[in-house]
């Protein structure tokens, strides 16, 4: 259930109740692809850095260790020892990124495992069964994420097929939730808007999927190489047709500025691998812009990564020490850097929520939307 607390223009402050707790929105979901954050960050650490929702990957967990294994271990929450909300994506993005290794038909997709090459079939029903076995709180509908750029005719055929797949997902999801031995009978389902970069397709598709009673709606297939302004234009185009009483999720986005601008356009949920991935390469976010800790100028720098940050890394270690760890290729460098960047993203959405509560979101947007895209 989604409760809209207040609005500032199109920006929304809300609360979304799940079987494993209430999520305060806007929210950034921390990406643990295989049930863990890359960089030796545990579920216990996620609590310390302010994570509300963990996101895991259906495709990867289906291949390894197998969703049947996770089910026998009591579901993903028990398996990874995380008692907060979990969202699982449908596996569609990963399957469709295997361009030369998959074949699409109405029933679903046949693809070759990136691990051992074995042929695997996944369709709407299979995706729902896997996610039911994982026991996540939010399951994502199985969709096709088309390549960018995509021909209009193919994008149209694809989003029509994705609509039919959503209907099948909904039927299978309802059936699975009613079974007596299901891992998480309160699991919710989000539908996904597609249509490439064609606004007319996006609007048509959003209107159609909104007729199917999902628990939330996502905008997918963006941040795949299109100009940032095109992404914003698509969000602006579909937002009027997204149900007001359901959460909105912008998939795979993005930079701190993208998140601020997404909130300004009515988005509630975000996820991205960027903070953890950048951290593993020494690229860290601060309230003054981003820095690259591997640069020579930090060799004798006694400051924390960010004077304004109170994450465990900034409370205890200097830029000079962290630079040394990176240069020495110590695993601790990855852990400390990832924890900082994820803390920063979680703090960013907390500060956005605080600004919305205070009626000061536009001032926050003006102060930080451009600044956070710059180098410090």
Can you say where each PLM-predicted feature lies in the sequence?
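Hydrophobic alpha-helical packing residues
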Residues: 21, 162-169, 209, 238, ...
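Conserved, mostly hydrophobic/aromatic
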Residues: 21, 54, 89, 131, ...
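Glycine-rich phosphate/ribose-binding loops and adjacent secondary-structure elements
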Residues: 160-163, 172, 176, 184-305
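C-terminal extensions of enzymes
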Residues: 1-17, 23-32, 39-40, 143-149, ...
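Structural signal for hydrophobic packing residues in well-ordered secondary-structure cores
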Residues: 135, 166, 170-173, 177, ...
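Non-catalytic, usually N-terminal nucleic-acid engagement modules in DNA/RNA processing proteins
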Residues: 1-183, 296-299
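Glycine- and acidic
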Residues: 148-151, 156, 216-222, 331-334
